[in-house]
Structures are given as structure tokens and as C-alpha cells.
């Protein structure tokens, strides 16, 4: 296989398939035996444009989705050790995973599910340690130099992927209909 587009994206594809499978299994487990849940969950997990787009990139977004889906699975099963380990991996994969796990810890703490809150907080320690270790770089001007300035065209392109051509009038119509 060597260095090819396929080998570059293979991990993302596998993570996307794994994350989608976990999400579908979670939906079926929560469905209480309703027959339409499986095909709908399969459709949403494997035909949505956003996960498909992230699965074809050579980045860690699909891995983050897999880890967060596993974290929710173990959290629902109240398996604190597995939840904490996967929360740690999600936090180390992407900052969004860290903040999502900390939000879940706050929610679990407010709900007095101390074992789950503790597992998520303990799972956050490696990522918080990494942030402290790399703070000099993260807060320097050179850390975000590869990110372009905010651009209205990027917003419109993202909306067009979700809503189709001419997304702004459609979004305005949607806001008017909802409001």
C-alpha cells in the first residue's frame, strides 16, 4: 500500500466505521425494540455528509467520534473504568473531546453520579497535563498560523453542504418558519 491516499485515510475510514457501528448499536439499545430504529440509525450514521467528509480526511476527527461514541456507550452502561480510559483517549485526541468529557463530568456531578463524574475527571487529567506541558506553544502566535482568518465564504460553504444551494435564503426561511 505504501504512501498513498488510501493508506493515509485508512485509519479515518476504520474509525468512521467503528464510530458509526457504536452509534448504531447505542441507538438500537435505546430504542426499546422499535423496528424502524436500525435502518434510520444506519442511514444517519453512514450517509450523513459530515461524518463522510471527516472520514475521508487524514485527520483525527473520525477517531474522536469513535472515542466519544464509546465513552457514551460505557457511560450509559455505568462502566467507570472503561469510561474513564476512553474519556482520556478522547481528551488526548482533540481538545473538543476533553471539553465534552468535562461537560459530562459536570452533568454527572450535578446528577450525583459521582463514580461517572470521577471517571471523567480522572480521564481528563492526561489531556490537561498535556495542555499545561505545551502551553507555551499553544498560546504563542505561531500555534495558529496555519488557520486562515474568518471568512464569510467558508460559513456559506459549510451551510451549503448542509442545506444545498443558496443556503442563506433557506436558513432565513427556516428561522421565519420556526420563529
Which functions belong to the PLM regions below?
Residues 1-31, 36-179:
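Membrane-proximal helix-loop-helix interfaces that form the catalytic/acceptor-binding platform
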